[in-house]
C-alpha cells in the first residue's frame, strides 16, 4: 500500500524533468540551420534602393 504514493510522487517528480522531444528537436534544428534554411535571403532590390539613396546625393554633390 505504501508503494502507490511513492510511485505517484516519483512520477510527479520525473515528468517535469523529462525534456520535451519536439522542443529539443526544434532547438537543435534552429541551431544547425543557416540563413538559407530559415528563408533569410537578402533582397537585391532593397540593397539597390539603399545604395541609390545613399550614393545619389554624393554623386550629385560631386558633379555640381
Swiss-Prot record:
Residues 1-19 form the signal peptide. It comes from the Eukaryota. The keyword rRNA processing does not apply. It is found in: Secreted. The modification Lysine amide is found at residue 63. Keywords: Amidation, Cleavage on pair of basic residues, Neurotoxin, Secreted, Signal, Toxin. GO terms for molecular function: toxin activity. Disulfide bonds: none annotated. Residues 20-43 form a propeptide. Expressed by the venom duct. The mature peptide does not contain cysteine residue. Belongs to the conotoxin T superfamily. This is Conotoxin VnMLCL-05.
Amino acid at each position: 500500500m505504501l508503494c502507490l504514493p511513492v510511485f505517484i510522487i516519483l512520477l510527479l517528480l520525473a515528468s517535469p524533468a523529462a525534456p520535451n522531444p519536439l522542443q529539443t528537436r526544434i532547438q537543435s534544428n534552429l541551431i544547425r540551420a543557416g540563413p538559407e534554411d530559415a528563408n533569410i535571403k537578402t533582397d537585391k532590390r532593397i540593397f539597390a534602393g539603399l545604395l541609390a539613396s545613399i550614393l545619389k546625393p554624393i554623386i550629385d554633390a560631386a558633379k555640381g
